[in-house]
Amino acid sequence: XEIYNKDGNK
């Protein structure tokens, strides 16, 4: 999958 930060951005 992909990793997102707490703001939901890549």
From Swiss-Prot:
Subcellular location: Secreted, Primary cell wall
Tagged with keyword Secreted: yes
Cellular component annotations (GO), alphabetically ordered: extracellular region
Keywords, ordered alphabetically: Cell wall, Secreted
Its biological purpose: This protein is present in the macrocyst primary wall which is produced by amoebae during the onset of sexual reproduction.
Protein name: Surface protein P34
Organism whose genome encodes this protein: Dictyostelium mucoroides
Lineage, top ranks: Eukaryota, Amoebozoa, Evosea, Eumycetozoa, Dictyostelia
Gene expressing this chain: P34
